[in-house]
Amino acid sequence: MDLIGFGYAALVTFGSILGYKRRGGVPSLIAGLFVGFLAGYGAYRVSLDKRDVKLSLFTAFFLATIMGVRFKRSKKIMPAGLVAGLSLLMILRLVLLLL
């Protein structure tokens, strides 16, 4: 079972809900829930086959890119820098699973 992947998905999902409660951005909530769902489904697929990392890798790369750009623009660690950093770590972990 890919506990790290499921934890990452839960963090993304929880973060989108928390962001919605603080700021009230419905599009951000929908996007966060969708990306969290993709990350969770990707973790499920990795749980079944350790080499099936395509969806998880795509999701982490997408989130790292989007949040990395936000971090570069805002210079704020929370939440953009944290999510970008965690996504980069997730990418590294997934690539290592392929080796």
Swiss-Prot record:
<dbReference type="GO" id="GO:0043066">
    <property type="term" value="P:negative regulation of apoptotic process"/>
</dbReference>
<dbReference type="Pfam" id="PF03647">
    <property type="entry name" value="Tmemb_14"/>
</dbReference>
<comment type="function">
    <text>Inhibits apoptosis via negative regulation of the mitochondrial outer membrane permeabilization involved in apoptotic signaling pathway.</text>
</comment>
<dbReference type="InterPro" id="IPR005349">
    <property type="entry name" value="TMEM14"/>
</dbReference>
<dbReference type="GO" id="GO:0031966">
    <property type="term" value="C:mitochondrial membrane"/>
</dbReference>
<comment type="similarity">
    <text>Belongs to the TMEM14 family.</text>
</comment>
<dbReference type="GO" id="GO:0005789">
    <property type="term" value="C:endoplasmic reticulum membrane"/>
</dbReference>
<dbReference type="GO" id="GO:1901029">
    <property type="term" value="P:negative regulation of mitochondrial outer membrane permeabilization involved in apoptotic signaling pathway"/>
</dbReference>
<feature type="transmembrane region" description="Helical">
    <location>
        <begin position="1"/>
        <end position="21"/>
    </location>
</feature>
<protein>
    <recommendedName>
        <fullName>Transmembrane protein 14A</fullName>
    </recommendedName>
</protein>
<feature type="transmembrane region" description="Helical">
    <location>
        <begin position="79"/>
        <end position="99"/>
    </location>
</feature>
<keyword id="KW-0812">Transmembrane</keyword>
<keyword id="KW-1133">Transmembrane helix</keyword>
<dbReference type="GO" id="GO:0070453">
    <property type="term" value="P:regulation of heme biosynthetic process"/>
</dbReference>
<keyword id="KW-0496">Mitochondrion</keyword>
<dbReference type="InterPro" id="IPR044890">
    <property type="entry name" value="TMEM14_sf"/>
</dbReference>
<feature type="transmembrane region" description="Helical">
    <location>
        <begin position="24"/>
        <end position="44"/>
    </location>
</feature>
<keyword id="KW-0256">Endoplasmic reticulum</keyword>
<keyword id="KW-0472">Membrane</keyword>
